[in-house]
């Protein structure tokens, strides 16, 4: 039995000064009927809470830590940079070096602008698309989360889905009217939207692998169909690769699926665990951004040297071979979960993409937000608490992706499968 007394005390204090006791809603553990676990430190594939409980970590700070916790080279890069000064508000050479690395690895990006979060990246890309096309409407997909920008919270996933909110109060009717939504993986729905609004649509923004309703890969022809539609109607195709960038493949999801968007949004991995975002794409589009062009975007800490050094050192270390290992480990996890769930008579549907995967307690194949919502949420809540008690730290929401790092091995996968078997035995009797 795990002891969480220090975490409970810390949460009680946090609620006095933070809304709901946290700085991001899903961290409150409300959807799993538990109090949040306060972490103290991490190393490799493991994380340890303030009570001294150690866990195999499948959250990895919600995706950024693809090299695991406290990677020595990343920590060293941050330390050396901090000793020189934490921020200057001027250009630094490391910004250019990280930009070159991103351009080398992400097929669609010819020029890139660094920002401070994934939300800032998607908001800026949307503004750029509207300014470039002189149009106002945006098409997005139900259950996809593109950050907390107002126009992108319409029928969103991630924490919005976790809380069961269709939209967020505070989003104006005008913004909602300019946001068109269709189900993810529904190319026919997208075609109908373009038939009705085609000349008004500035851009389609899509996660090439939806990671905020669980993990939902694109069906055959979906991304290709969006590329054809946007080209036909003169709209821009924006890939939100904040989560999938450098997680699905060495060349990101667009490289794996061989579909090239006009603009790409990045975050998470390219900051190595520090706040960062980026958006980039075709030179002719990106040069519309100030000071080269008239579409404004700026940021006090954009391209700050700590995040740039952490991101550069993270991306630099990744090799194509890492992704072969990721797929082998995820396959081992999938096969184990499938065997155990069948033996324990627990309905289970599994999706995977590179170093991320998702599982749903349902008999249905999960291809969009509606099918994701068929998962047995009551079973998930009980399952989550049992797994946590056995030292497995998973996202405290059915609608979040699960991640592995270069520090996860067969040992961690097998321990997780043992815990899953024990949990299913307890819950199924």
UniProtKB/Swiss-Prot annotation:
What InterPro entries does UniProt report for this protein, alphabetically?
A: 4pyrrol_synth_GluAld_NH2Trfase, Aminotrans_3, Aminotrans_3_PPA_site, PyrdxlP-dep_Trfase, PyrdxlP-dep_Trfase_major, PyrdxlP-dep_Trfase_small
Pathway(s) annotated for this protein in UniProt? Porphyrin-containing compound metabolism; protoporphyrin-IX biosynthesis; 5-aminolevulinate from L-glutamyl-tRNA(Glu): step 2/2
Listed GO CC annotations: cytoplasm
What's its catalytic activity? Answer: (S)-4-amino-5-oxopentanoate = 5-aminolevulinate
The protein's required cofactors: pyridoxal 5'-phosphate
Which GO biological process annotations does it have?
A: protoporphyrinogen IX biosynthetic process
Gene3D superfamilies assigned: Aspartate Aminotransferase, domain 1, Type I PLP-dependent aspartate aminotransferase-like (Major domain)
Enzyme Commission numbers on file: 5.4.3.8
On whether Cytoplasm is a keyword of this UniProt record, the answer is: yes
What is the residue range of the signal peptide feature? none
Keywords in alphabetical order, please. Cytoplasm, Isomerase, Porphyrin biosynthesis, Pyridoxal phosphate
MF (Gene Ontology): glutamate-1-semialdehyde 2,1-aminomutase activity; pyridoxal phosphate binding; transaminase activity
What is the annotated localization of this protein? Cytoplasm
Q: How does it assemble?
A: Homodimer.
In the record, the note on similarity to other proteins reads: Belongs to the class-III pyridoxal-phosphate-dependent aminotransferase family. HemL subfamily.
What's this protein's name? Glutamate-1-semialdehyde 2,1-aminomutase 1
**Native species:** Listeria monocytogenes serotype 4b (strain CLIP80459)
């Amino acid at each position: 039995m795990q002891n969480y007394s220090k975490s409970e005390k810390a949460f009680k204090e946090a609620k006095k000064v933070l809304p709901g006791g946290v700085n991001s809603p899903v961290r409150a553990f409300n959807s799993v009927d538990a109090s949040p676990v306060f972490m103290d430190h991490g190393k490799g594939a493991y994380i340890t809470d303030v009570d001294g409980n150690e866990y195999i970590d499948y959250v990895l700070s919600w995706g950024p830590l693809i090299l695991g916790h406290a990677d020595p080279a990343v920590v060293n890069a941050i330390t050396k940079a901090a000793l020189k000064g934490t921020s200057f508000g001027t250009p630094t050479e490391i910004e250019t070096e990280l930009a070159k690395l991103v351009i080398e690895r992400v097929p669609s990006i010819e020029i890139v602008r660094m920002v401070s979060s994934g939300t800032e990246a998607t908001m800026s890309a949307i503004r750029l698309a509207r300014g470039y096309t002189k149009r106002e409407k945006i098409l997005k997909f139900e259950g996809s989360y593109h950050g907390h920008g107002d126009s992108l919270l319409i029928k969103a996933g991630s924490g919005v889905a976790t809380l069961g909110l269709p939209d967020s109060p505070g989003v104006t009717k005008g913004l909602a009217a300019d946001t068109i939504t269709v189900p993810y993986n529904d190319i026919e729905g997208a075609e109908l939207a373009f038939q009705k609004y085609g000349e008004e649509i500035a851009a389609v923004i899509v996660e090439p692998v939806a990671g905020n309703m669980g993990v939902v890969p694109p069906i055959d022809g979906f991304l290709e169909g969006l590329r054809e539609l946007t080209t036909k109607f003169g709209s821009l195709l924006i890939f939100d690769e904040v989560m999938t960038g450098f997680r699905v493949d060495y060349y990101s999801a667009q490289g794996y699926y061989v579909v090239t968007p006009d603009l790409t949004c990045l975050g998470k991995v390219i900051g190595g665990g520090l706040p960062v975002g980026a958006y980039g794409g075709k030179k002719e589009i990106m040069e519309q951004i100030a000071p080269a062009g008239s579409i404004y975007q700026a940021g006090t800490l954009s391209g700050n040297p700590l995040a740039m050094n952490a991101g550069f050192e993270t991306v630099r270390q990744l090799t194509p071979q890492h992704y072969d290992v990721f797929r082998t480990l995820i396959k081992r996890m999938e096969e184990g979960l499938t065997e155990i769930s069948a033996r324990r008579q627990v309905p289970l549907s599994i999706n995977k993409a590179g170093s991320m995967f998702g599982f749903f307690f349902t008999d249905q194949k999960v291809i969009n937000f509606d099918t994701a919502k068929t998962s047995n949420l009551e079973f998930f809540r009980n399952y989550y608490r049992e797994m946590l008690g056995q030292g497995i730290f998973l996202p405290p929401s059915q609608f979040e992706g699960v991640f592995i790092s270069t520090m996860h091995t067969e040992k961690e996968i097998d321990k997780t499968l043992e815990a899953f078997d024990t949990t299913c035995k307890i819950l199924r009797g």
